[in-house]
């Protein structure tokens, strides 16, 4: 949401204290943002250890402002700069490369079918398990050709009833079919969810065939059924039934089986599923699971080699993460963000999110660009939400549209520094994107920013006038103000996938794929943040708008309705991501989708971006700050 303007800011009350060395000094990322030493009743406004309700304070000119006391930055620059790791040494890369060659040989041996370990009775499931393991371990980029060959082979035996464990299997089984369905659908093969109908109980509606005793083999089959059910398309009723059935079954199984690698796997799959499971976080979890595995299911595969590659790759990338994080922290410190006492500082968390989404070493531009854009819109969100006055916001929005450093002349001092950091950072990322795309990209970014700030101004007008919009009107504006286009568009353009204007339209606003993602993020954000927003005087949310249009409904009714909307929209996103009639490169759509997954991960229980809670700190630690034991 945007600002409540408690008192209008007159031209005489513009902050005049000079905190910036030179307004027109254009050295990249050198702009210093002022330390706003606001005082309320003689006390400095400082960070608290938790997020609290807004506090009204007055600046030196008597302008009342609202301050939300967010907890301070958890990862100071001294700590970040002190990080070290040995895994940047060439010997680790050389060891990983040797193992990659050996694993390519494992793929070849599976294809050879030696008649002893690999036979026509298990050749399909072994190919699927191999593909599933390398993907969950985050090392699949090394085996693209081998994966394609394995899946082409499996698909050649796919039929309307699914598949069995081998090419000579006479009967389809649930485990092979569910695992095969999931992997094939994710790789763009045409597979119908109707195959799952053949595994349902004839007499029990919504139930699937299972024995009275939960054997380990059966539990694994139902686990793969659950994983498959999460990539449902709209209208697939059998997928809904499969999700409900398998979730209940697996929760019961956890009560009955001993703590083991299987129970750990069930727990993390139920916890993060598909929509909130970021690639690097899944890799970290699966490394832990396989580290405890008794290896009985890997009789025909050398899992030790796969696991060692995964650990080496994880730690080698960890050394790159440290270098990038140090660069980001210096940018944050040198730009003066630490002096903004009214704003959240979550740049480390945003970098962790970016590096959980994109783990290719050559895409540093994506990770750093994503983290910087997220941090910038967080600061702007806090200004438009609480700190700025209406006149200041109008001035800033108008200055931004001019896109010229001289436009800062009329801005208050604290906005001048911020404007220049935004200006320089957007231009910096645009230059990198221009090289990747072979064309000018700044105008794409500027259009996204202008729409973003316009949506903030619309929300500011609602609040200042006390207007509560209709649900539809609210969503049209607020799905833009979430800022997805800002932190997704430019970083994606820095990647080495050429995106013409025509192709870009498939993943950018207002096309369906982008619109769905923006809607999901706004709806999920509101279910986690509406109480805190309301306490700060920001009434409009999807919850309050729904209740206005449905007299007599409760907050619980509204939240249930919104969650149902999100579930349906996610199915539509699945379809838009995986459908084969689009022209956009699947890798770009996948990155956009992974950004959605990462954002939803932060909203699983609460607003994990405003308040870096235990869960947030844990995944930052496990995916960025710590290596895995070899």
From Swiss-Prot:
Q: Where is the transit peptide?
A: 1-52
The kind of enzyme this is, by top-level EC class, is lyase
State the free-text cofactor note.
Answer: Binds 3 Mg(2+) or Mn(2+) ions per subunit.
Kindly list the cofactors needed.
Mg(2+); Mn(2+); K(+)
Annotated binding of Mg(2+) 1, by residue: 381, 385
Q: Which residues bind Mg(2+) 2?
A: 381, 385
Per the record, GO CC terms?
chloroplast
* Binding residues annotated for Mg(2+) 3, in chain numbering: 525, 533
Reactions the enzyme catalyzes:
(2E)-geranyl diphosphate = terpinolene + diphosphate
Q: What is its EC number?
A: 4.2.3.113
Q: InterPro entries, from UniProt?
A: Isoprenoid_synthase_dom_sf (IPR008949), Terpene_cyclase-like_1_C (IPR034741), Terpene_cyclase_plant_C1 (IPR044814), Terpene_synth_N (IPR001906), Terpene_synth_N_sf (IPR036965), Terpene_synthase-like (IPR050148), Terpene_synthase_metal-bd (IPR005630), Terpenoid_cyclase/PrenylTrfase (IPR008930)
Q: Name one GO molecular function term.
A: magnesium ion binding
Q: What's its job?
A: Involved in defensive oleoresin formation in conifers in response to insect attack or other injury. Involved in monoterpene (C10) olefins biosynthesis.
Q: Which family does it belong to?
A: Belongs to the terpene synthase family. Tpsd subfamily.
**Miscellaneous:** The conserved 65-Arg-Arg-66 motif may play a role in the isomerization step of the terpenoid cyclization reaction sequence.
Its domain description in UniProt is: The Asp-Asp-Xaa-Xaa-Asp/Glu (DDXXD/E) motif is important for the catalytic activity, presumably through binding to Mg(2+).
Protein name per Swiss-Prot or TrEMBL: Terpinolene synthase, chloroplastic
- Give me the gene this protein comes from: ag9
């Amino acid at each position: 949401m945007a600002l409540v303007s408690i008192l209008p800011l007159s031209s005489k009350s513009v902050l005049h204290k000079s905190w910036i060395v030179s307004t027109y000094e254009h050295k990249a990322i050198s702009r210093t943002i002022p330390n706003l030493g606001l005082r309320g009743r003689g006390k400095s406004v400082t960070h608290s250890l938790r997020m609290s309700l807004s506090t009204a304070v007055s600046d030196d000119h008597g302008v009342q402002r609202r301050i939300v006391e967010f907890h301070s930055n958890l990862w100071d620059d001294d700590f970040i700069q002190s990080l070290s790791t040995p895994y940047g040494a060439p010997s680790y890369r050389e060891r990983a490369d040797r193992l990659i060659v050996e694993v390519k040989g494992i793929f070849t041996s599976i294809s050879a079918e030696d008649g002893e370990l690999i036979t026509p009775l298990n050749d399909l499931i072994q190919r699927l398990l191999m593909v599933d393991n390398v993907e969950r371990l985050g090392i699949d980029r090394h085996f693209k050709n081998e994966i394609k060959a394995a899946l082409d082979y499996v698909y050649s035996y796919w039929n309307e009833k699914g598949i069995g464990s081998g090419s000579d299997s006479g009967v389809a089984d649930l485990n092979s079919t569910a695992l095969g369905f999931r992997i094939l659908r994710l790789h763009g093969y045409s597979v119908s969810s109707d195959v799952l109908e053949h595994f349902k109980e004839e007499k029990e509606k919504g139930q699937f065939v299972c024995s009275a005793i939960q054997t380990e083999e059966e539990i694994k089959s139902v686990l793969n059924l659950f994983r498959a059910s999460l990539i449902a398309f709209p209208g697939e009723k059998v997928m809904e039934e499969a999700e409900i059935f398998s979730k209940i079954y697996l929760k019961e199984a956890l009560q009955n089986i001993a703590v083991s690698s299987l129970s750990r796997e069930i727990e993390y799959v139920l916890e993060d599923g598909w929509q909130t499971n970021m690639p690097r976080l899944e890799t970290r979890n699966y490394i832990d699971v396989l580290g405890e595995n008794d290896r009985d299911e890997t009789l025909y595969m050398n899992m030790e080699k796969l696991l060692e590659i995964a650990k080496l790759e994880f730690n080698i990338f960890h050394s790159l993460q440290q270098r990038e994080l140090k660069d980001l922290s210096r940018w944050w410190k040198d730009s003066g963000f630490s002096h903004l006492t009214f704003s959240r500082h979550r740049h480390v968390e945003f970098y962790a999110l970016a590096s959980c989404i994109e783990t290719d070493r050559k895409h540093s531009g994506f990770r750093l660009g994503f983290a910087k854009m997220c941090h910038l819109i967080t600061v702007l969100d806090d200004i438009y939400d609480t700190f700025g006055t209406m006149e200041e916001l109008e001035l800033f929005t108008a200055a931004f549209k001019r896109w010229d450093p001289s436009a800062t002349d009329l801005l208050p001092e604290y906005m001048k520094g911020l404007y220049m950091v935004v200006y320089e950072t957007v231009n910096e990322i645009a230059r990198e994107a221009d090289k990747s795309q072979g064309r000018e990209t700044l105008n794409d970014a500027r259009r996204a920013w202008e729409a973003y700030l316009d949506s903030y101004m619309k929300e500011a007008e609602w609040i200042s006038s006390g207007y509560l919009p209709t649900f539809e009107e609210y969503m049209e504006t607020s799905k833009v103000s979430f800022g997805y286009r800002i932190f997704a568009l430019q970083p994606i353009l820095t990647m080495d996938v050429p995106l013409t204007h025509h192709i870009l339209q498939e993943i950018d606003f207002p096309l369906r794929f982008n619109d769905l993602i923006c809607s999901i993020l706004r709806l999920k954000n509101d279910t986690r943040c509406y109480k805190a927003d309301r306490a700060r005087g920001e009434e409009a949310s999807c919850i309050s708008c729904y209740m206005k249009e449905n007299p007599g409904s409760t907050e619980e009714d509204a939240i249930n309705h919104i969650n149902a909307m999100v579930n349906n929209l996610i199915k539509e996103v699945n379809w838009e991501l995986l459908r084969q009639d689009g022209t956009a490169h699947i890798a770009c759509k996948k990155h956009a989708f992974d950004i959605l997954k990462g954002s939803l991960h932060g909203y699983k229980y609460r607003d994990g971006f405003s308040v870096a809670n235990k869960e947030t700190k844990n995944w930052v630690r496990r995916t960025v700050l710590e290596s895995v034991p070899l």
